[in-house]
């Protein structure tokens, strides 16, 4: 009887753990200097419910949307976030343009 009650008490918390968004940290060293798109040495990537992809600044914990789903969540007030351009680096090979987020979007999608 005690085991059944304990199991019933732990069951809801196990679902919460499974539903929690995954977060990984990526660095300039890991991704390569040529692909690195940010003004910081490392950032965190996460996938929130609905495949909303965000970059997180680990020192401030500010999150930045990197796909349309995430941007819509920020625009609607469902999530907090700042424009990604704040931490996006200029592309040295294409003056006036920012670095591509494609490798980071691809990596963040693996967390969904």
Name each region found by the language model.
Residues 54-87:
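Flexible, solvent-exposed short loops/turns enriched in glycine
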Residues 21-22, 39, 69-74, 82, ...:
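Contiguous interface-forming segments/domains that mediate binding rather than catalysis
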Residues 4-13:
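Sec-dependent N-terminal signal peptides
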Residues 77-112:
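C-terminal partner/receptor-binding element of secreted or periplasmic proteins
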Residues 19-61:
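N-terminal secretory signal peptides
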């Amino acid at each position: 009887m005690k085991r059944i009650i304990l199991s019933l008490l732990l069951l809801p918390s196990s679902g919460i753990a499974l539903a929690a968004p995954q977060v990984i940290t990526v660095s300039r060293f890991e991704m390569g200097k040529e692909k690195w798109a940010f003004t910081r040495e490392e950032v965190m990537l996460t996938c929130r419910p609905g495949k909303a992809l965000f970059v997180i600044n680990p020192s401030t914990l500010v999150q930045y949307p990197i796909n349309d789903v995430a941007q819509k969540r920020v625009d609607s007030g469902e999530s907090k976030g700042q424009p990604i351009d704040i931490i996006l680096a200029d592309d040295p090979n294409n003056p006036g343009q920012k670095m591509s987020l494609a490798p980071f979007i691809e990596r963040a999608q693996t967390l969904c």
